[in-house]
Curated annotation (Swiss-Prot):
Function description: Thiol-disulfide oxidoreductase that may participate in various redox reactions. May act as electron donor to the BAS1 peroxiredoxin. Possesses low insulin disulfide bonds reducing activity.
Annotated S-S bridges: 219-222
CDD domains: TRX_CDSP32
Name of protein: Thioredoxin-like protein CDSP32, chloroplastic
Main subcellular location: plastid
Organism of provenance: Oryza sativa subsp. japonica
Organism ancestry: Eukaryota, Viridiplantae, Streptophyta, Embryophyta, Tracheophyta
Span of chain positions assigned to the transit peptide in the UniProt entry: 1-47
Active-site residues (renumbered): 219 (nucleophile), 222 (nucleophile)
Subcellular location: Plastid, Chloroplast
Length: 301
């Protein structure tokens, strides 16, 4: 089975690296960022702005609906009790729930992508709720606030971390990569101590450029750019180390963001020999690649 990161970064990357060019300032090509926190006195409340954008219990597998053979890893649930049980059983694994309807053409169109992801991403659980199946599923949709289908909700530790509706295969794959990536070369950082340890490993002669991707759990632009980060972590492995941190994961991460004066996400910090030598704020693929090349000493025109 191919790794989650390798498959998803290929599927989600709608723009090839070879064709990426730096965006010019202003205009429609400008990258997006999520306004995230304002500078204020230490101890003040931080308001995060969401940018526009063990096995599960035995249950009935989805039948029909465009699935056919090979969709046995997409598990259909029929009630709130079944969904809650599946979320508890998953523990810290990512769970992706599609809320669909039998009459929805768009639900049928996106389902093959869901099946393909379930085959490849062995560390992610995929569940399906047919909202018009019964009174129990209609009540579950009301509880979860589902007003349109297909609607995708992402859970970790039984906590809702992200949701989308009306999306296509590329965005679904990108979302699964962002919230479920544990296998790529991107180093996952969970505290200030993790950051300091990584920086220490790359001090002195032979040390690599460290690119730290700082984001939030719920951030559209952060999700958008992450497949590019995964690709770069492989193609630039000889010269550059890529890492990421979600500022809202815990108090240590949030304190680190404040100390680094991060006020918008995604922010990329470029660290060389223990010093922050620059930063890029935004989600533009071409702009990000150009900045990384520049801090690696490559002349960019």
């Amino acid at each position: 089975m191919a790794s989650t990161a390798a498959f998803l970064s290929t599927l989600a990357g709608s723009t090839s690296l070879g064709g990426a060019t730096p965006a010019s300032g202003g205009g429609s090509g400008r990258s997006k960022t999520a306004r995230f926190l304002r500078r204020r006195r230490r101890g003040g409340a931080v308001r995060a702005a969401v940018s526009g954008t063990e096995q599960a219990p035995e249950t009935t597998k989805k039948k029909g609906g465009g699935g056919g053979g090979g969709d046995e890893r997409v598990v259909q649930v029929h009630s709130a009790e079944e969904l809650d049980g599946a979320l508890r059983a998953a523990k810290e694994r990512l769970v992706v729930v599609e809320f669909a309807a039998s009459h929805s053409v768009n639900s049928s169109r996106i389902y093959p992508c869901m099946v393909e992801l379930s085959r490849t991403c062995g560390d992610v659980d995929f569940l399906l709720v047919m909202g018009d199946e019964s009174d129990a599923t209609r009540e579950l949709c009301r509880r979860e606030g589902i007003t349109a289908v297909p609607h995708f909700t992402f859970y970790k530790g039984a906590e809702k971390v992200h949701e989308e509706e009306g999306i296509g295969p590329d965005q679904l794959a990108g979302d699964v990569l962002y919230y479920g990536d544990h296998h790529s070369a991107v180093v996952q950082l969970h505290s200030r101590a993790d950051v300091e340890s990584l920086i220490s490993d790359h001090r002195g002669e032979g040390g690599k450029l460290v690119v730290l991707d700082v984001g939030l759990k719920r951030c559209g632009p952060c999700v958008k750019v992450y497949p590019t980060v995964v690709k770069l972590s492989r193609t630039m492995a000889d010269t550059t180390v890529f890492a990421r941190m979600n500022g809202d994961e815990n108090d240590s991460c949030m304190e680190f963001l404040r100390d680094m004066d991060v006020v918008e996400v995604p922010t990329f910090l470029f660290i060389r020999d223990g010093d922050i030598v620059g930063r890029y704020v935004g989600s533009g693929r071409g702009e990000l690649i150009g900045e990384i090349l520049r801090y690696n000493g490559v002349k960019v025109t």
